[in-house]
């Protein structure tokens, strides 16, 4: 059964994103479903005594290992893990603005937004105008990024920039040319998504899941 699951970020999260140059990494505003699955897999494997055994020439995978699993409380989880569904995580009550969503060019979401396809008035002229903005001749533009699904206001993900370096463990000094910065999702926010754990008991309130890197 699919369930809506909320995640409270207890630390900054760096996941996916782009490398603007050799020393500046930027996280995406969302958390990929594959990254979330890997976080749950890591949690399971940390409790498994057979985590490094090969199955089909692969190591470190969640899989049912027959009678050796014995009375482990994760048996049903391991049996069904490959069939489970993990959606992307977005800030709670948000989604990406559809391509047909428009907002006032001058005042943004302070004025009512409109969908040019779902609009009640489908005449081309009125459909591409903000009717509350005479001072800007009613011009509208594409909405971009995340929007709150309740208020239709644009949602800005809080970010955190931190500086990191690599250590040479032989000399216990900083490696040359190893200083870099991370632009990550800031801790303290609530992210939400859909997970189908196949009624295996995987989802338990209060679990700590580690996702992303450098955080």
PLM features: residue spans?
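Conserved active-site/ligand-binding neighborhood in enzyme cores
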Residues: 1-215
């Amino acid at each position: 059964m699919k369930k809506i699951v909320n995640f409270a970020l207890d630390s900054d999260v760096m996941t996916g994103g782009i490398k603007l140059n050799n020393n500046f990494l930027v996280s995406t505003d969302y958390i990929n479903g594959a990254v979330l699955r890997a976080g749950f897999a890591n949690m399971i494997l940390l409790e498994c005594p057979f985590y490094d055994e090969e199955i089909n020439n692969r190591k470190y995978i969640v899989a049912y290992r027959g009678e050796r699993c014995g009375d482990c409380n994760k048996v049903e989880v391991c049996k069904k893990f490959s069939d489970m569904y993990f959606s992307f995580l977005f800030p709670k009550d948000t989604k990406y603005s559809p391509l047909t969503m428009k907002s006032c060019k001058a005042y943004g979401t302070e004025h009512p937004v409109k969908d040019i396809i779902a609009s009640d008035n489908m005449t081309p002229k009125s459909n591409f105008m903000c009717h509350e903005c005479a001072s800007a001749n009613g011009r509208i533009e594409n909405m971009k990024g995340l929007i709150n699904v309740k208020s239709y206001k644009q949602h800005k993900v809080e970010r955190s920039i931190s500086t990191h370096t690599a250590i040479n463990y032989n000399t216990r000094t900083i490696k040359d040319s190893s200083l870099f910065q991370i632009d990550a999702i800031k801790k303290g926010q609530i992210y939400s998504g859909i997970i189908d754990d196949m009624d295996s008991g995987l989802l338990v309130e209060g679990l700590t899941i580690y996702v992303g890197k450098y955080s």
